[in-house]
């Protein structure tokens, strides 16, 4: 058995031990149903590289362990994400009067529009999460989507939700490493990625794989997490913000916008458009749900979401998880996860306020036609 197949087998077995076969639960009900010893192991795997060190050797270890680290990260945070954010694990712009769910859907529709996705096209979703964007985009366009993910638990959930929503004839979700895609060359009409390829050890590696499986003339559209031109890695405050984002979001290294742009060009893409959608004069910033400022709430329906994601809501969640962990209802290490997510929230808001970071650097790129 190859090394990659052995890793997949081991991850699948661990996922079954940790989560069981019940994918219908979410949020706290899912958290308290975990295998306690397996959850403790999963937390340890996730946090083992996050010891406060930001030197080159620490970065190298995180980059080398990207697959296992990302798999472990989503094993421990998926339930928290669904509880706080829903099934689309990404940020979006907000317009006055627009609900949270409408904002998220519009953000996904916009990317589908930029990718030129049409009815019955075969599309690849790179880093598909639990399939929220894929379900929305398939409904919007009528396309067929294959979602690629390295986390078995999220794949199980994505396939369950697709069947629940009667979209299983249009959607499928498969296990794979986006640095070593196993699809045939020139397979997909378009490819998109939403805040996922930031988990790659290098942009060039993942973009090169996307280029390979995309048909000639096809479009790749991505919302990329990058540090902006205002970021100075030699500035301790800036590096602290980047590290908080890396720690709380399971990212081995935050790269610059230049790194993403250069990687796209180097692997052969023609960049058609680039636009930092976070660099705007919007009255409501993209990081509004994390601030705890109630002036940003647009509708009564959003009160619960904004509470869960606000500073107060996150503190409440941490307190509740602390109690659950002490009572033995939540696995040991659950509080460490909420603390890491809190660090991420602090870093994301600071990075957004100072315009050092963007979660929505839009690149639209084309694979040239064959001559």
From Swiss-Prot:
Highest taxon, organism lineage: Eukaryota
InterPro entries for the chain: Erg6_SMT_methyltransf, Methyltransf_11, MeTrfase_SMT, SAM-dependent_MTases_sf, Sterol_MeTrfase_C
Protein family: Belongs to the class I-like SAM-binding methyltransferase superfamily. Erg6/SMT family.
Keywords assigned: Lipid biosynthesis, Lipid metabolism, Methyltransferase, S-adenosyl-L-methionine, Steroid biosynthesis, Steroid metabolism, Sterol biosynthesis, Sterol metabolism, Transferase
Pathway the protein contributes to: Steroid metabolism; ergosterol biosynthesis; ergosterol from zymosterol: step 1/5
GO biological process terms held by the UniProt record: ergosterol biosynthetic process; methylation
PANTHER family: HYPOTHETICAL LOC100005854, ZGC:194242
Pfam families, per database record: Methyltransf_11, Sterol_MT_C
GO cellular component, one term: endoplasmic reticulum
Keyword S-adenosyl-L-methionine found: yes
Listed name of the protein: Sterol 24-C-methyltransferase
Known catalytic reactions: zymosterol + S-adenosyl-L-methionine = fecosterol + S-adenosyl-L-homocysteine + H(+)
E.C. number: 2.1.1.41
Protein encoded by which gene: ERG6
Example GO molecular function: sterol 24-C-methyltransferase activity
